[in-house]
Amino acid sequence: MGRIRKLDDLLANKIAAGEVVERPASVVKELVENAIDAHSTVINIELEEAGMAKIRVIDNGDGMEEDDCLLAFERHATSKIHDEHDLFRIRTLGFRGEALPSIASVSEVELTTGTGSGPGTKLVLQGGALVSRERAAGRKGTDITVSNLFFNTPARLKYMKTIHTELGHAADVVNRLALAHPDVSFRLRHQGKTLLATNGSGDVRHVLAAIYGAETARQMIPIEAESLDFTIRGYISPPDVTRASRNYISLVVNGRYVRSVPLMKAIEAGYHTLLPIGRYPIVFLSIEMDPVLVDVNVHPAKLEVRFSKEAELNELVTDAIRQAFRKRTLIPSVSADSKMAKPKAEQAAWTFTHRVREPSVLSSDIGGGEDATAPLAPLTGDAPAERPSAAVQTDECGILDEHGPAFERKQEEEVGEERCSPRLPTDGQAEDKAAADRLPPLYPIGQLHGTYILAENEHGLYMIDQHAAQERINYEYFREKLGEATKEVQELLVPLMFEYPADEYERIAACRDELARCGVFLEPFGPRAFLVRSHPTWFPKGREREIIEEMIEQVLAAKTVDIKQLREQAAILMSCKRAIKANQHLRQDELFALLEALRQTTDPFTCPHGRPIIVHFSTYEIEKLFKRVM
């Protein structure tokens, strides 16, 4: 008798549940996605003990007929695809027909559903076996409760985390589904306490406000981009609004929230040099494309996807983020922690008039160049002390209506106060700013501790980190100077020797041509060593060995060398080494030239490491600190 036998359905479902149902959050995801596929507009999720004790999902969707109820718990039974061609044009969130039987096999399930055109149906299942079947009220929609998860697989229970951790995973799933479907009203409750409530208005900003708070939602910057194959829309946080992990980046493809490492890298490339190391933005991107261009049938959980034109999509995402930042002045503003008050009637408006000192030619090299020492025209203007404190109408989430009169009044009130946390932009703000216009003219008035430059204009006071400012100036200079990899090489007086184990030596020897194309020529020297007698001229002095070792490591790991990345690292290194340091006092003309050189850079707001360069104290905020407005 043969040893191979067919598994019974219950055992097969338990095995499938190992991939589909990893934790309570997996059940929440599958049930809510079914509700969305059923065209629900209101979905309520109730959890007890983070879903381990009970998960209940109630929707007002299409519901099911009695016969469909029974088939729904059969393996590979689905209403969402019919033949193999449908696999390449999937528009629904579910399609595999595995979720419900897998969930039912490791829990107790009670399902009540109806189409609204007759009596409903109620099913009770335990461990995948049907316990009871009866008629129920004919309410349109579905009410499904999953209890005692993993009751018959105690080994799985051992791997569950704390209630707090499991609840966090479940809430994260609902948050991302709510972002992906802003036209659906979601309500998530745990032990009777509401954790999330969205209004289903279709405005993603309202969902962002419900998840991250109204203040964060107000600061989010809208982005959009389009190509022949892709349409991208979403919101990104300014560089000063960051988090400690990538968990706040939400990606949605054709209404399905997904995970994609290449897209994550494309987003981070868009923020390049704008974020400090270890900090990540808040991002929501919705990407629409022909279903033929994306494969969602990679894993039973349907979170990982593959794109047919991945490089094109990544480039579009990166460019969209960069374009959004090029349209804005990203100077953080410092505000006084006090309620906005109306100025006293006797407080007169003051006038800003600055007499420009024509700077002399610099004796020290601060990277300004001739343009930085050109005299500037005097800047005069009136900056009223009074800032109206009239209430501004907002919607229920605390977000200004960008098309209403209240938003226009608010914009008028803030003329002259360019902020890093912009209000929701109007369509007229889509014009690109020239590099120098992104940073207003600044007039130095001194230094603080020989480290920070104090400058002024009609908008208030500015503090500039002089080291970070020249880092940015130097970085853009060296990045352009290095250019493309050159064939010019610098001969070494003393050759560099690199030794490797025998296995790595053979792999490196096989990739010598790749390194030679980059200007690094490896000469075999003995059984396990190479000599390098020259290097490209763009290598920073004193860092030759380190860069060559990194190039060899890239060859070992990826069989290729990313010259662009190496040049980028070299530019950052040289910009930092050659920048003025803290506690270095500068003359007035040197301060002036440094600020003008900073204005000419393409990104004058952060250093190459992502740290802020400049902070703004508005005139109004300063007057509040001194109680000149009461």
Swiss-Prot record:
SMART domains (UniProt xref): DNA_mis_repair, MutL_C
Keywords annotated in UniProt: DNA damage, DNA repair
Function as written in the Swiss-Prot or TrEMBL entry: This protein is involved in the repair of mismatches in DNA. It is required for dam-dependent methyl-directed DNA mismatch repair. May act as a 'molecular matchmaker', a protein that promotes the formation of a stable complex between two or more DNA-binding proteins in an ATP-dependent manner without itself being part of a final effector complex.
Pfam families for the chain: DNA_mis_repair (PF01119), HATPase_c_3 (PF13589), MutL_C (PF08676)
The keyword DNA repair belongs to this UniProt entry's keyword annotation: yes
Family: Belongs to the DNA mismatch repair MutL/HexB family.
Cellular component GO terms held in the UniProt record: mismatch repair complex
Region of interest called Disordered, as start-end residue ranges on this chain: 361-386, 407-431
InterPro entries (UniProt xref): DNA_mismatch_repair_CS, DNA_mismatch_repair_MutL, DNA_mismatch_S5_2-like, HATPase_C_sf, MutL/Mlh/PMS, MutL/Mlh/Pms-like, MutL_C, MutL_C_dimsub
Compositional bias (Basic and acidic residues): 407-421
CDD domains: HATPase_MutL-MLH-PMS-like (cd16926), MutL_Trans (cd00782)
Name used for this protein in its record: DNA mismatch repair protein MutL
GO biological process, one term: mismatch repair
Secretion signal, residue range per the UniProt entry: none
SUPFAM superfamilies found in the cross-reference section: ATPase domain of HSP90 chaperone/DNA topoisomerase II/histidine kinase, DNA mismatch repair protein MutL, Ribosomal protein S5 domain 2-like
Single GO MF descriptor: mismatched DNA binding
